[in-house]
């Protein structure tokens, strides 16, 4: 996702109307250049921002991936409580009313789940954290989506590491032995949604969040809230513990098998080396080796 300056630079025109402090403000650009200076207009009770723009056909082709655009608009309706989106791709108007983050999780969950989705939320120092998660029975990978101000942080960041740490800490608190982070992530489906005033990203592509303070906020929220859910929902906790213990056993069995394979390889290498010791004579009759195929 890019900002208004970037969109303006690649648009044939870009107009913005802002409703705030009881007035309407307008500004307009063409080909990235200012053509309508900022103007304070009429009084209004409205709030919000209206953006109109058209991508420059000298930069972009006329072909637009409408399916991708519709998917993004639906994603925005999930991430923003109270938001209504209307769009028309030429075949009639579509209204997307705000849906919950829980609905988003259900939309991306393709396997049978252990229980109902768990939802946690906290606000601290102008930062709001929303987390929704569930576990699937027959899923051995994981799906964790992370967002910051509607930007999909595909490479994760401090909010993701805080989420993982919180999950692990909560499950350790109920006494599961030999547990690792890989064990608790198996079968997990989750969404972490952050709203903050001044996000700090690694690089211009905004794919990785660098905010240690948010890591702690997410970790504390998930650890405390998930621990409470595990304490209150005994059946869910029992089923999840059973699933994780299966993952732990599979990991330990695989580790043991690898160790046994290494020992066998080492023993075989020792025997082969002993039989094929380095030559210490220059006499070919004493140093030659014949390899015969067959019996």
Stretches with model-predicted labels:
Residues 5-9, 13-295:
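GHKL-family ATPase ATP-binding module
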Residues 1-3:
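Conserved P-loop NTPase motor core
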């Amino acid at each position: 996702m890019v900002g208004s300056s970037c969109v303006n630079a690649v648009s044939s025109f870009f107009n913005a109307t802002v409703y705030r402090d009881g007035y309407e403000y307008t500004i307009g650009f063409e080909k990235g250049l200012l053509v309508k200076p900022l103007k304070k207009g009429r009084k209004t009770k409205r709030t919000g921002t209206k953006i109109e723009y058209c991508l420059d056909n000298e930069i972009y082709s006329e072909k637009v991936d409408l399916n991708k655009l519709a998917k993004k608009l639906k994603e925005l309706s999930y991430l923003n409580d109270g938001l209504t989106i209307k769009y028309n791709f030429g075949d009639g108007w579509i209204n997307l009313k705000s849906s919950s983050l829980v609905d988003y999780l259900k939309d991306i969950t393709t396997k049978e789940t252990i229980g109902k989705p768990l939802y946690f939320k906290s606000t601290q120092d102008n930062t709001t954290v929303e987390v929704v998660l569930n576990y699937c029975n027959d899923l051995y990978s994981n799906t964790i989506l992370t967002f910051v101000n509607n930007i999909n942080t595909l490479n994760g960041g401090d909010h993701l590491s805080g989420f993982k740490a919180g999950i692990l800490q909560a499950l350790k608190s109920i006494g599961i032995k030999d547990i690792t982070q890989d064990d608790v992530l198996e079968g997990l489906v989750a969404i972490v949604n952050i709203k903050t005033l001044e996000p700090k990203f690694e690089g211009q592509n905004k794919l990785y969040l660098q905010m240690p303070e948010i890591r702690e906020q997410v970790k504390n929220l998930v650890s405390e809230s998930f621990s409470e859910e595990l304490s209150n929902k005994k059946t869910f906790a029992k089923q999840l513990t059973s699933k994780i213990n299966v993952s732990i056993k599979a990991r330990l069995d695989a580790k043991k098998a690898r160790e046994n394979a290494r020992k066998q390889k080492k023993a075989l290498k020792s025997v082969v080396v002993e039989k094929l010791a380095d030559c210490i004579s220059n006499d070919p009759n004493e140093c030659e080796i014949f390899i015969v195929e067959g019996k």
